[in-house]
Amino acid sequence: MIYGVGTDICDIRRIAATLQRRGDRFAERVLGPREIEVFRYRRAKVEARGLSYLATRFSAKEAFSKAIGLGLHQPMSWRSCEILNAPSGQPQIHLHGALADWFAQRRLIAHVSLTDETDYATSFVVVETQGL
């Protein structure tokens, strides 16, 4: 059964401006530990790839927070939710700490889809309850 649906569109130019103003502090506030490694790796290779990565993760976390109905209120936080790619490239949501506990107690599973173009990153999340 569907528990919630969330979507978000993010202007990559706004993320770029924020990153320029605040430096890596912005990325470190939004990204979890494994995400920050990927961000730095991608940005070192091609600046635009790092920026797109940050924007898609920002967008996906916004969409996820909407799908679970919490917004960015505890136990949901930027760093407690990571969007990591499986070896196949499929994005997957990995949760940590109190958010992982909250999610497990409700027997929820999440599916995420990401896309980006030159100026925009978009995410769609469906959260469903696991069968009894």
Curated annotation (Swiss-Prot):
- State its cofactor: Mg(2+)
Give the location in the cell. Cytoplasm
Q: What is the lineage of its organism?
A: Bacteria, Pseudomonadati, Pseudomonadota, Betaproteobacteria, Burkholderiales
Name the gene that codes for it.
acpS
Please give the Gene Ontology molecular function terms for this protein: holo-[acyl-carrier-protein] synthase activity; magnesium ion binding
Keyword annotations? Cytoplasm, Fatty acid biosynthesis, Fatty acid metabolism, Lipid biosynthesis, Lipid metabolism, Magnesium, Metal-binding, Transferase
According to the UniProt record, what class of enzyme is this?
A: transferase
Q: Which InterPro entries match?
A: 4-PPantetheinyl_Trfase_dom, 4-PPantetheinyl_Trfase_dom_sf, ACPS, Ppantetheine-prot_Trfase_dom
Q: Does the keyword Metal-binding apply?
A: yes
Gene3D superfamilies associated with the record: 4'-phosphopantetheinyl transferase domain
- The entry marks the following residues as binding Mg(2+), namely 8, 62
Q: Which family does it belong to?
A: Belongs to the P-Pant transferase superfamily. AcpS family.
EC assignment: the record states 2.7.8.7
Q: What is its main location?
A: cytoplasm
> GO cellular component terms?
cytoplasm
What function does the entry list?
Answer: Transfers the 4'-phosphopantetheine moiety from coenzyme A to a Ser of acyl-carrier-protein.
**Listed name of the protein:** Holo-[acyl-carrier-protein] synthase
Keyword Chloroplast assigned: no
Look up the domain of life of the source: Bacteria
Q: Which processes are annotated in GO (biological process)?
A: fatty acid biosynthetic process
User: Which chemical reaction does it catalyze?
Assistant: apo-[ACP] + CoA = holo-[ACP] + adenosine 3',5'-bisphosphate + H(+)
Species per Swiss-Prot/TrEMBL record: Leptothrix cholodnii (strain ATCC 51168 / LMG 8142 / SP-6) (Leptothrix discophora (strain SP-6))
Signal peptide start and end residues: none
